[in-house]
Amino acid sequence: MVQGLPGEFEDYLYRVIASLYRYAERLVVVDYPSSPTRRSIDLIVSLPGSRVVLIKAIYDASLISKKEVEELSAVANSLGVSAVIIAERMGREDLLTGVVYDRYGVNMVNLETFENFVSGREEVYVTRYKDIYTVSISSEKLREKRLEKGLSLGHLAYMLKTSRKSIYEYERGVMSPSVEKAEKLVDILGEEILEPIDILTSPRKPVSKRDFDKPEEALVGEKLLELGFKVSHAKRTVVDLVAGRSGEEGVGSRIMIVVKRSREGRERMMSRIMKGVKMGSILSSSLYAVVNREEKSLIKDIDYTKTIVKDVREFINDVSRGRVEENEE
């Protein structure tokens, strides 16, 4: 059940959900907070090939702020999963099918493009960053084909009416050609130089989010950082802290933590915990409720959610000893 969405937001989210059910091995809807424009994550999807994706789905992407997108990216990065925005418009402009847009460092595509990608029907080669369209090419193939043709950097640059430095940067993989230049390169060197874009790989390095709200969050977050975890603080989704160890799998490699928020009552915290359990099941993440000793009585009957409840000192002692528990099934 998706709650609290105005009509057009609800319609589009259900459309995305209906589409992804055809391709996903598992799918979890994250309907917290209730406002779709304040929520960083709408869906968590497990795709074939063991690829897990955090998705923000909104018809008009201009309605979500940089803060929501940066949190989406940071949470995905800490957990070692992918992040994608699915939208149809950016203000008055329709998103083009077959184009990957860079929205604050997260790949953004329309639903048709995402369907084509996950189904394998059609590969994507064009990226738009700000107002510039570029084409993805293989730097290695470009160099290989240029040498096969017996072309120097200068000669190829002359044929493209560009600089020698630009060709050099293409071959280093630090710059991509415009659509016009890419078409000329394909005419000269062949389609083998094109390289499909992996929509599930972020175009830029994610920004870490560690602006902790409470002393408990800071204590827990700093200890996890000290132990080698990537840590992000979240304000616009169910959990408050996420942490993961790069390249590791299994128990203890991913942790999500719910911390009691200011003026948050028992029912609201329990609701977040139950939603967090669903998130953890698809992310293969342990879920902790970290509280102070006085707050333990607030959630004393939490056992039915299979959540691990610790006060701050207990949690820090456990993770310091490498003891990260797994939620019961």
From Swiss-Prot:
Known DNA-binding region: 153-172
UniProt key word Transcription: yes
Keywords, ordered alphabetically: DNA-binding, Transcription, Transcription regulation
Molecular function in Gene Ontology: DNA binding; DNA-binding transcription factor activity
InterPro entries: Arc_TR_HTH, Cro/C1-type_HTH, Lambda_DNA-bd_dom_sf
Residues annotated as domain HTH cro/C1-type: 142-200
HAMAP family according to UniProt: HTH_type_cro_C1
Name of the protein: Putative HTH-type transcriptional regulatory protein APE_0778
